[in-house]
Amino acid sequence: MAKFFLTAAFAAAALAAPVVEERQNCAPTWGQCGGIGFNGPTCCQSGSTCVKQNDWYSQCLPGSQVTTTSTTSTSSSSTTSRATSTTRTGGVTSITTAPTRTVTIPGGATTTASYNGNPFEGVQLWANNYYRSEVHTLAIPQITDPALRAAASAVAEVPSFQWLDRNVTVDTLLVETLSEIRAANQAGANPPYAAQIVVYDLPDRDCAAAASNGEWAIANNGANNYKGYINRIREILISFSDVRTILVIEPDSLANMVTNMNVAKCSGAASTYRELTIYALKQLDLPHVAMYMDAGHAGWLGWPANIQPAAELFAKIYEDAGKPRAVRGLATNVANYNAWSISSPPPYTSPNPNYDEKHYIEAFRPLLEARGFPAQFIVDQGRSGKQPTGQKEWGHWCNAIGTGFGMRPTANTGHQYVDAFVWVKPGGECDGTSDTTAARYDYHCGLEDALKPAPEAGQWFQAYFEQLLRNANPPF
């Protein structure tokens, strides 16, 4: 899996800061603080400044400086850097970003957001603030069609998961997101908001990929580093026990243990993957937390030769972890393109009888339950709106043509085994470059069914975002 670092510099005229007494009513760091049609707060909480990105969007950026006088305000240019990393999950790429600073956990929880049954019921899902800023600062300024601009603005408000793919993201993105949600809930959000987070930092991560580049190696204290990462997540989640938190656990990892044990890196990582996944499930077993282990997708573990070994593996992990209450089930189609339910199988799925996620889950669940794991499911539909896609083969994962934004996140799935349809991967970040001379070039990104020309993995891919937007089903 390629890991790409992108420095995004934001610089614009900073707005004057309000007096301290008013800041409790201001937007949090990374929150929106202005723009055409925006009716929310136009000031920022202490430590950040409202910076205009374009006519449609102003954002609270940390560390911005502003000087004021009694009659006028003089704005200085502010630059905020964020590290951006990308990860290939189930044959495609997902993105997560982190500010390069550490924040202090404000206050403490006075209640516990415990739940019974489906953790997606009785809550609202939180829209990813960084993805919102990407859409408003990178996508919308390049769109001239007013209707498409309005549609893009609507995409920015769709709740999506936040990825913790490096240790630095724990004390930055996780704390900031939970702080923002706490503030919104304390301000009277009804129903309250819940957080959606991806735990994703195993050593020797994504073992079957052509160019894995996670931050830790098993041979270099990786297991202990990962336990520290999980321990810190646990500490923060306990501090925010008033915020219900839904976790996807380690995309690709266990699925690779089913199908890719012929890959030396995977066979070498197998025992560590199992040990650390069990460690994470035990440590994050908290009353306000719900966990879903990643279980690939219909075109991966859904094949008849793979589905029973997959059931055996996931049930064994669940049992060895002590059947934690917070382990609700499995996540499928993470960062992929598969339909939830389609009337006839696309040609590229043949001859798999489980040609969509519904068939996969309905075949998978009884096998799991028979082994003591009555798993519920969540299904990523962020890029699954257009069916069939333009893929020539099911394994063609990179920037697939003919895709669109899919059904919006909801707990109203109409299916007894499915807790929610979700957007684990927000659309618009590139899966990989089509430049054959690039160091991170993967041949999948140069295939005829991959959209080209494509920038490096993790960079904003405007043409792909607009493809998803134009093909969205339902439309925005």
Swiss-Prot record:
SUPFAM superfamilies: Cellulose-binding domain (SSF57180), Glycosyl hydrolases family 6, cellulases (SSF51989). Disulfide bonds join 33-50, 44-60. Pfam families: CBM_1, Glyco_hydro_6. It comes from the Eukaryota. Glycans are attached at residues 144, 153, 167. It catalyses: Hydrolysis of (1->4)-beta-D-glucosidic linkages in cellulose and cellotetraose, releasing cellobiose from the non-reducing ends of the chains. The keyword Transferase does not apply. This is Exoglucanase-6A. It comes from Humicola insolens (Soft-rot fungus). The lineage of its organism: Eukaryota, Fungi, Dikarya, Ascomycota, Pezizomycotina.
